[in-house]
Amino acid sequence: MKMGLALLIALVAAPVAGAHSRDFPILRSTRAVRIRYRAHDGRLRPAWLLLPVGYDGRPIPLVISPHGRGVDAQSNARLWGDLPGEGGFAVINPAGEGRRLGYYSWGARGQIADLARMPAIAAAHGVNVDTRRIYAIGGSMGGQETLLLLAEHPHLLAGAAAFDPATDMRRRYYDFASLRDGRLLQRLARREIGGTPASDPLAYEVRSPDHYIEQIANADVPLQLYWSTRDRVITDQRAETGLLAIDVRRDDPDARLWDFTGEWQHTAEMRASRRLPRALERFGLLPWRDVPGRDFRRVPVTSV
C-alpha cells in the first residue's frame, strides 16, 4: 500500500497520539489512546490505538483488530493486554460502522473499506506504519471481517488470523434462533443486512467469507484459523471455519494456512493470556521466548 502526498504530510505534521487514556488500565509496556475517525457514511467513530510506551516515531508494524458483534472497541483493545509493547507493534481497534448499525456491522462493504483505511488513519495520528507489515486479527464477527478484508484487499496485508469467525451469514441468521437473545439478533441482522436470507440472499452471501474462497486462497497471505468443537455461539464450526479451511486448501494446495482447533469457549483464545501470543509469534510480531506454553491440536485440513 502506498501513501499519497496528503498522508505523508499528515504523518510528518501530526504528533504521535496523545497521553495514555484514563479509561484504560495502566500497563508496563503499552499505552492506549482513544482517537476518532470518519467512517464511510460520514459519522465520527472512536478507535483505540495501542502503542509501545516510549514510541519514538520509527516505522512500526500495525495490527487492525475489528471487534466481535455487540462488543465495543475498548473491550476488544483490552484483549491485547501488554502484547503491543512487548512485541513493538501498534494495534488499532475501530468501533466500526455497518450499513445501519455500529456494533453489529457483520461485514458491511463500507465497514471493510473503513478497515482498509486504518493504516492511513493510524498514520494521520502520528504512527509511522511499516506498510510491509500490516496484519488483521479478529474474533467472531471480527474474524469474519478479518477474512473479508483479506479477500477484498489482499495486497494490504502481510498476515491474517481469525478466531472462531462467522463464515456463512445465511447459516448464522437461522442459527441465531437457538441463542438466548436469538430473536433480537435476527431483528438486528434484518435491519443491518436488509432483510432475511430468503428475501435477499445476495446481501447475506456477500458478507460471508465462504463466498470468497478463491480470493482468500489466491491472496498468497499467511492465514491462521482457530475454531472450537465446543463453541456454543457458532455451534457448527466444523461446517463453517473447518470447511472454509478445507476449501481454501483445495483451491490452493500451497496456501500458507494454519488451521487449529480445540475445545475452548467462543473466542476465549483471542486474548493475551491464551493463544493470541502464539498467533503473533507466527507473524514475527512477538519473540517466541515471550509466548506462554499451552497445549492444543493442529487439525489436518482434509475433510469435514
Predicted regions and their residues:
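C-terminal catalytic histidine-bearing segment of alpha/beta-hydrolase fold enzymes
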Residues: 224-226, 237-304
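Acidic catalytic loop of the alpha/beta-hydrolase fold
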Residues: 229-235
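Mobile cap/lid helix-loop segments that gate and shape the active-site cleft of serine hydrolases
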Residues: 70, 75, 171-215
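Short substrate-entry loop that stabilizes the transition state in hydrolases
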Residues: 55-60, 65-104
